[in-house]
Protein backbone atom coordinates (compact mmCIF):
# COMPACT_ATOMS: atom_id res chain seq x y z
CA UNK A 1 0.00 0.00 0.00
CA UNK A 2 1.37 3.43 -0.94
CA UNK A 3 1.59 6.44 1.38
CA UNK A 4 -1.19 8.12 -0.61
CA UNK A 5 -3.46 5.13 -0.11
CA UNK A 6 -2.68 5.11 3.60
CA UNK A 7 -3.61 8.78 3.97
CA UNK A 8 -6.79 8.24 1.99
CA UNK A 9 -7.83 5.31 4.17
CA UNK A 10 -7.13 7.37 7.31
CA UNK A 11 -9.27 10.22 5.96
CA UNK A 12 -12.12 7.91 5.04
CA UNK A 13 -11.84 6.24 8.42
CA UNK A 14 -12.83 9.56 9.96
CA UNK A 15 -15.87 9.54 7.67
CA UNK A 16 -16.74 6.00 8.73
CA UNK A 17 -16.70 6.89 12.43
CA UNK A 18 -17.80 10.55 12.49
CA UNK A 19 -21.06 10.83 14.39
CA UNK A 20 -23.28 13.28 16.19
CA UNK A 21 -22.98 16.37 14.00
CA UNK A 22 -25.80 18.90 14.12
CA UNK A 23 -28.46 18.45 11.42
CA UNK A 24 -29.84 21.15 9.20
CA UNK A 25 -33.33 21.95 10.42
CA UNK A 26 -35.88 22.75 7.75
CA UNK A 27 -39.52 21.85 8.06
CA UNK A 28 -41.24 20.28 5.11
CA UNK A 29 -44.38 22.07 4.03
CA UNK A 30 -45.04 19.79 1.06
CA UNK A 31 -46.35 20.86 -2.35
CA UNK A 32 -49.99 21.94 -2.47
CA UNK A 33 -50.30 20.61 -6.01
CA UNK A 34 -51.48 17.40 -7.60
CA UNK A 35 -51.33 15.99 -11.10
CA UNK A 36 -48.92 14.21 -13.38
CA UNK A 37 -45.80 13.20 -11.44
CA UNK A 38 -43.95 11.41 -14.25
CA UNK A 39 -41.42 14.26 -14.41
CA UNK A 40 -40.15 13.26 -10.95
CA UNK A 41 -38.83 10.02 -12.41
CA UNK A 42 -37.04 11.63 -15.37
CA UNK A 43 -33.90 12.23 -13.27
CA UNK A 44 -33.40 8.51 -12.58
CA UNK A 45 -32.40 5.62 -14.86
CA UNK A 46 -35.28 3.36 -15.92
CA UNK A 47 -33.20 0.47 -17.30
CA UNK A 48 -30.14 -1.40 -16.11
CA UNK A 49 -26.99 0.69 -16.24
CA UNK A 50 -23.36 0.88 -15.23
CA UNK A 51 -21.57 4.14 -14.44
CA UNK A 52 -18.19 5.44 -13.34
CA UNK A 53 -17.93 8.63 -11.30
CA UNK A 54 -15.10 10.74 -10.00
CA UNK A 55 -15.94 11.45 -6.36
CA UNK A 56 -14.58 14.35 -4.32
CA UNK A 57 -15.21 13.64 -0.64
CA UNK A 58 -14.95 16.18 2.18
CA UNK A 59 -15.78 16.02 5.89
CA UNK A 60 -17.02 19.21 7.58
CA UNK A 61 -15.48 21.32 4.82
CA UNK A 62 -11.96 20.03 5.44
CA UNK A 63 -9.47 18.23 3.17
CA UNK A 64 -10.85 16.81 -0.05
CA UNK A 65 -9.82 13.42 -1.41
CA UNK A 66 -10.64 12.05 -4.83
CA UNK A 67 -12.13 8.58 -5.20
CA UNK A 68 -13.68 6.53 -7.96
CA UNK A 69 -17.14 5.02 -7.75
CA UNK A 70 -18.42 2.25 -10.00
CA UNK A 71 -22.14 1.51 -9.80
CA UNK A 72 -24.34 -1.02 -11.54
CA UNK A 73 -28.07 -0.63 -11.05
CA UNK A 74 -31.31 -2.39 -11.88
CA UNK A 75 -34.27 -0.08 -11.17
CA UNK A 76 -36.87 -2.75 -11.89
CA UNK A 77 -35.36 -5.06 -9.26
CA UNK A 78 -34.46 -2.22 -6.87
CA UNK A 79 -30.88 -3.48 -7.03
CA UNK A 80 -27.48 -1.80 -6.75
CA UNK A 81 -23.89 -3.04 -6.89
CA UNK A 82 -21.21 -0.50 -5.97
CA UNK A 83 -17.45 -0.29 -5.66
CA UNK A 84 -15.49 2.48 -3.95
CA UNK A 85 -11.88 2.72 -5.13
CA UNK A 86 -8.81 4.89 -4.80
CA UNK A 87 -7.62 6.65 -7.99
CA UNK A 88 -5.03 3.87 -8.31
CA UNK A 89 -7.77 1.23 -8.41
CA UNK A 90 -7.39 -0.08 -4.84
CA UNK A 91 -10.80 -1.39 -3.70
CA UNK A 92 -11.94 0.08 -0.39
CA UNK A 93 -15.44 -1.33 -0.42
CA UNK A 94 -17.64 -3.50 -2.61
CA UNK A 95 -21.28 -3.95 -1.65
CA UNK A 96 -24.71 -4.59 -3.05
CA UNK A 97 -28.25 -3.67 -2.10
CA UNK A 98 -31.43 -5.42 -3.16
CA UNK A 99 -34.93 -4.71 -1.85
CA UNK A 100 -33.43 -2.57 0.91
CA UNK A 101 -31.08 -5.29 2.17
CA UNK A 102 -27.34 -4.58 2.07
CA UNK A 103 -24.55 -7.14 1.72
CA UNK A 104 -20.81 -6.44 1.93
CA UNK A 105 -18.78 -8.35 -0.66
CA UNK A 106 -15.36 -6.88 0.10
CA UNK A 107 -14.11 -4.25 2.53
CA UNK A 108 -10.97 -3.16 4.32
CA UNK A 109 -11.05 -1.85 7.88
CA UNK A 110 -12.68 0.39 8.97
CA UNK A 111 -15.10 -0.03 6.05
CA UNK A 112 -16.10 -3.52 7.13
CA UNK A 113 -18.61 -2.01 9.56
CA UNK A 114 -22.18 -3.04 8.62
CA UNK A 115 -23.44 0.39 9.71
CA UNK A 116 -21.02 2.19 7.38
CA UNK A 117 -21.86 -0.06 4.43
CA UNK A 118 -25.58 0.35 5.02
CA UNK A 119 -25.28 4.14 5.23
CA UNK A 120 -23.16 4.35 2.10
CA UNK A 121 -25.54 2.20 0.08
CA UNK A 122 -28.48 4.31 1.26
CA UNK A 123 -26.64 7.34 -0.15
CA UNK A 124 -26.08 5.51 -3.43
CA UNK A 125 -29.75 4.61 -3.58
CA UNK A 126 -30.78 8.21 -2.96
CA UNK A 127 -28.58 9.32 -5.85
CA UNK A 128 -29.57 6.74 -8.44
CA UNK A 129 -32.97 5.19 -7.69
CA UNK A 130 -36.34 6.88 -7.33
CA UNK A 131 -38.05 6.76 -3.92
CA UNK A 132 -40.19 3.70 -3.27
CA UNK A 133 -43.94 3.91 -3.70
CA UNK A 134 -45.99 6.68 -5.23
CA UNK A 135 -45.67 10.39 -4.39
CA UNK A 136 -48.19 11.67 -1.87
CA UNK A 137 -48.46 14.85 -3.93
CA UNK A 138 -46.84 16.59 -6.85
CA UNK A 139 -47.27 19.16 -9.53
CA UNK A 140 -45.78 21.89 -11.66
CA UNK A 141 -45.54 25.51 -10.55
CA UNK A 142 -46.00 28.65 -12.62
CA UNK A 143 -42.23 29.16 -12.85
CA UNK A 144 -41.87 25.75 -14.49
CA UNK A 145 -40.36 23.95 -11.50
CA UNK A 146 -41.74 20.53 -10.64
CA UNK A 147 -42.27 19.20 -7.13
CA UNK A 148 -43.01 15.73 -5.76
CA UNK A 149 -43.26 14.61 -2.15
CA UNK A 150 -42.98 11.06 -0.83
CA UNK A 151 -44.22 10.81 2.76
CA UNK A 152 -43.75 7.79 5.03
CA UNK A 153 -45.97 6.71 7.94
CA UNK A 154 -43.19 7.44 10.47
CA UNK A 155 -43.15 11.12 9.44
CA UNK A 156 -39.98 11.04 7.34
CA UNK A 157 -40.13 12.25 3.75
CA UNK A 158 -38.30 12.71 0.46
CA UNK A 159 -38.95 15.73 -1.75
CA UNK A 160 -37.81 16.27 -5.33
CA UNK A 161 -37.97 19.75 -6.81
CA UNK A 162 -36.55 21.46 -9.90
CA UNK A 163 -36.43 21.42 -13.68
CA UNK A 164 -34.13 20.24 -16.44
CA UNK A 165 -33.12 23.85 -17.12
CA UNK A 166 -32.45 24.94 -13.54
CA UNK A 167 -31.32 21.67 -12.00
CA UNK A 168 -32.87 19.42 -9.36
CA UNK A 169 -32.82 19.18 -5.59
CA UNK A 170 -33.62 16.07 -3.54
CA UNK A 171 -34.21 16.55 0.19
CA UNK A 172 -34.63 13.77 2.72
CA UNK A 173 -36.02 14.57 6.17
CA UNK A 174 -36.28 12.43 9.27
CA UNK A 175 -39.26 11.97 11.60
CA UNK A 176 -38.56 15.33 13.30
CA UNK A 177 -38.47 17.20 10.00
CA UNK A 178 -34.69 17.71 10.12
CA UNK A 179 -32.89 17.55 6.78
CA UNK A 180 -30.52 14.57 6.84
CA UNK A 181 -29.55 14.52 3.15
CA UNK A 182 -29.62 17.03 0.31
CA UNK A 183 -28.74 16.16 -3.28
CA UNK A 184 -28.17 18.65 -6.11
CA UNK A 185 -28.38 17.34 -9.68
CA UNK A 186 -27.31 19.21 -12.79
CA UNK A 187 -27.31 18.08 -16.41
CA UNK A 188 -26.83 17.16 -19.03
CA UNK A 189 -28.55 13.86 -18.22
CA UNK A 190 -27.35 10.66 -19.89
CA UNK A 191 -29.94 7.87 -19.71
CA UNK A 192 -31.27 9.30 -16.46
CA UNK A 193 -27.82 9.93 -14.97
CA UNK A 194 -26.89 13.51 -14.10
CA UNK A 195 -23.49 14.72 -15.27
CA UNK A 196 -22.92 16.52 -11.97
CA UNK A 197 -24.20 15.50 -8.53
CA UNK A 198 -23.53 16.75 -5.03
CA UNK A 199 -24.68 14.99 -1.87
CA UNK A 200 -24.62 16.85 1.44
CA UNK A 201 -25.10 14.81 4.60
CA UNK A 202 -26.05 16.55 7.85
CA UNK A 203 -27.11 13.79 10.23
CA UNK A 204 -25.73 11.74 11.91
CA UNK A 205 -22.42 12.50 10.14
CA UNK A 206 -21.56 15.73 8.29
CA UNK A 207 -19.85 15.25 4.93
CA UNK A 208 -20.11 16.18 1.26
CA UNK A 209 -19.66 14.09 -1.88
CA UNK A 210 -19.30 15.73 -5.28
CA UNK A 211 -19.71 13.30 -8.19
CA UNK A 212 -18.79 13.88 -11.83
CA UNK A 213 -19.97 11.38 -14.42
CA UNK A 214 -17.00 9.85 -16.26
CA UNK A 215 -18.66 6.99 -18.12
CA UNK A 216 -22.18 5.59 -18.48
CA UNK A 217 -23.53 2.58 -20.30
CA UNK A 218 -26.11 -0.20 -20.21
Language model segments and positions:
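Sec-dependent bacterial lipoprotein signal peptides
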Residues: 1-21
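Bacterial Sec signal peptide processing site at the extreme N-terminus
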Residues: 16-37
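N-terminal mature ectodomain segment of secretory-pathway/periplasmic proteins
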Residues: 45-105
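A short, polar/proline- and glycine-enriched secondary-structure boundary/capping micro-motif
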Residues: 91-96, 114-118, 180-183, 207-210
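Acidic/charged, solvent-exposed loop-and-adjacent secondary-structure segments enriched in E/D, K/R, S/T
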Residues: 103-132, 136
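Gly/Pro-enriched, hydrophobic low-complexity segments
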Residues: 145-218
